[in-house]
Amino acid sequence: MADIHILVADDSAGQRLDAYLGANDGCPTRSACAHLIEGGAVAVNGETCLSKKCAVRAGDRISVDLPEPHDPTDVIPEAIPLDIRYEDDYLIVLSKQRGLVCHPAHGHESGTLANALVYHCGIDHLGTVQGEDRPGIVHRLDRDTSGLMLAAKDDDTQRALQNLIRTRTLDRRYITLVHGHIAMDEGTINTGIARSTRDRVKMAVSDDPFARQAITTFKVLDRFDSTRFDDGYTLVECHLFTGRTHQIRVHMRHINHACVGDPLYGKCDARADQGLTRQFLHSWRVAFDHPVTGERIECRDELPWDLAAVLDDLAPRSLGRTAAGDDIVPQLGLLEA
């Protein structure tokens, strides 16, 4: 993603957000900006704004996440298997496997989740609020993060689901294993997150006025004893109240407990990383009120084999589950649960 930061001048106050952005150098056309706004790519004073009609005010700090440019191409249907956990006429809940990119970008023009969704649903039966190259995509998971995701079959449903994220009523829970022992059994991390000024591939905790607010709560499920090769581990459930790029990975690094196996924010020590070649991070539970039917939807997803194998190996080193761990760990599909 490319970032654009704009400070609204006095003489621009009162303009519609899409019109204001469309007239700024570095931003695309007004209609393209409207799509970016509706897709959750625009923040005003650190908060995502989904209304293109919102009037800007003098002194507003606006951040725009522009997709990386790539050659325009139709998203070609590809028969990539989808692990669907719930589906109706409006939306899909699926489990994304590790290694699967969500949508086409440079270096990944095919073989993405978007290609699979077009094959499964047809391009005319997917929401395009996020852009023609991101059909159906409501929110993203990093390539090597596995687990539950949502896809929408029309624009109205896509907007409604993104609004659940904006209003923090889409309940998303992740399981991660981190280095070291987190001292407290639960906590909240509330910071700004912005692109790193040292490495543009990374995100970082930031107090920059243009940083976007990121809130993660966590509960410790289990701790595992240390050895001469590592500092021990903590198994954690994280609850996302916002959806910033790399949010959990950045927040865990911020409290000095990086996700095991994380190639960007972790230790990059094969032995300490338990042989993992990707971050130990899995979207295990989503729950929300269906935006059309009102039905309560809740899906859970056991850990994939590579992550489960790590925990099975660590089980003899357990220092004792917490009360939250007694409730959650048996639902993760572990041999030792």
Residue ranges of predicted features:
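Short coil-to-beta-strand transition motifs
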Residues: V75-A79, S206-T216, F280-L281
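RNA pseudouridine synthases
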Residues: M1-T188, G192, T197, R300-P316, ...
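Short Pro/Gly-enriched beta-strand edge/turn motifs at strand-loop
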Residues: V64-P67, R198-K202, Q213, Y265-R271
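Conserved hydrophobic positions within beta-strands
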Residues: I84, V178, F218-V220, C259
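Pseudouridine synthase
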Residues: E109-C121, K153-T157, R166, T191, ...
